[in-house]
Amino acid sequence: MFIPEKLPIMALPGTCLFPGGKMPLHIFESKYRDMLNDVISGNRMFCIGTLRESESSFEEGDEILPYSTAGLLRACVMNNDGTANLILEGIKKVKIINIENNKPYKVGKVQTLETTINDFEKITSSSDQLKSILIANYSDRVDPNMEKQLNQILKNLESPEDTLYFAAQHFISHQENSQKLLSLENLEDQFDLIIKILDRQ
């Protein structure tokens, strides 16, 4: 899918979208209502800009971290009060290289990031290892039926890359780890990092 050189940015603290991830969003601020109107009338794409965490409250001028994912608007329900509920699906990793402030919302000039694979056998093995870690460490954190549900989800994932980004979307919470994962080009390196993170949590 074609990714435009510029994408609207919805800046949020503690939030990161990965390829294949589906993120529900509630739009209520005036600037993001304007953004949504432009997105709907355009290519239906924008990205989540992760605000750098700090001890103070988040302000308009706070730093947006560079790595993100171009997202496609998959569903949108407009409410009578002018707010909206939508689903944004992650499409492709991007790096925000410049931010424009000439609209009510921020617009980022982005560079798409490719993923490389050097050893598919290692990737397949790492994917199986990651699935085992998820089942062993996370299946009982929500409810007793979670292991069965998680097994089915993992079984339905079509590729090792899908497995990695599913784990990243749902089980990586620290922004430094999310940014590092998005920044890595090589899929083997991404698996090494996420396995190291999740196996010690």
Locations of regions flagged by a protein language model:
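N-terminal low-complexity, acidic/polar interaction/targeting segments
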Residues: 1-201
